[in-house]
Structure formats: C-alpha cells, structure tokens
Amino acid sequence: MARGCRLAARAFPAYAGLGDLLCASHHRHALELLGSPATEGWQVATGLTPAQVDANGFGLYTAAHYDELVDCPVEMGRFWRGSFTVGGVPHEFVVAGAAPSFDGERLLADTQKICEAEIAFWHADGSQPPMDRYVFMLNVVDDNYGGLEHRNSTALICGRRDL
C-alpha cells in the first residue's frame, strides 16, 4: 500500500513521529514538510529525495517504498551545514546547537578522511557505494552522546566540549 504524509512544522526543531502525521493513500510514498511563521530561518535536512522543496528544504520529499520513508530521519531548525564528495557520493553534514567557536571546516575535513578510508575498504573493487548521497545530522547538547545509523544518513548526539 502506498502512503503519503503531510507534516506542519511545529515551533521546535524536532521531528514528529509517524504517529503524529496525517497520512493518506497516494501512488507514491511522500512526506510534505510545511513551513510557517514559527519556522522563519529554519532549514530541513533528511536523506529523503527532494521532489519539490524551497531553498530551506521545506516542501515535498519522496521515498521509493515505505521502509525508506520511515528510515530517513528529518532534522528541522537552525543549524550549520557543510558538504563534501567521496567516491562520487555527495555527503552533507548538519550541526545543530554548536557554539559559535565550532570549527565546521575541521569537522568536514576529518569526516571526509574517515569516509574516504571506509569507501576504499568496502569498495576496493571499484564498485559504487549503495547510496546516492549521505547526510550526517549532529545535535550538540550539554552532556550526552550517541547515534543511530540509517540507510543513507546518521542521527548523532555529542556534548559541546567534544567539538
């Protein structure tokens, strides 16, 4: 069964669970993120495929199937954003909650080296990585850590002093 979802952004930078979404049957799997005056200056980051989005990422996203739809977390809010390409795959890094002294360029350079080593190891035969793009979503908090890997993204938490 195909599913589509519509989500109006709330007044906080968090993703509402699927239970909070208003879903209706469609011919494709989709998620629509609607901006509002409360989301002025916010951006969206997700591993979902953008179908029709504005400059900040609000709009319509699609997924090939339901499993992909529910395995792509969404980050909404004010955050730093940077990118690099490894093995022909664009990688994006978004960081929410970092101090103004945060060194984004160093984080990108270090992460790029790790991704280059991983792709060289797992794809030494020259095969392409299994994703079209990859998104790192890092939430910086006072004192915590953790993360969860997804199909083409990862949702991470770290303490401010770790940056």
Where are these regions (language model features)?
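Juxtacatalytic substrate-recognition/specificity segment
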Residues: 83-163
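Structured, charged N-terminal subsegments at the starts of enzyme catalytic cores
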Residues: 75-76, 81-83
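Extended, low-hydrophobicity, Ser/Thr/Pro/Gly-biased non-transmembrane segments
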Residues: 1-75
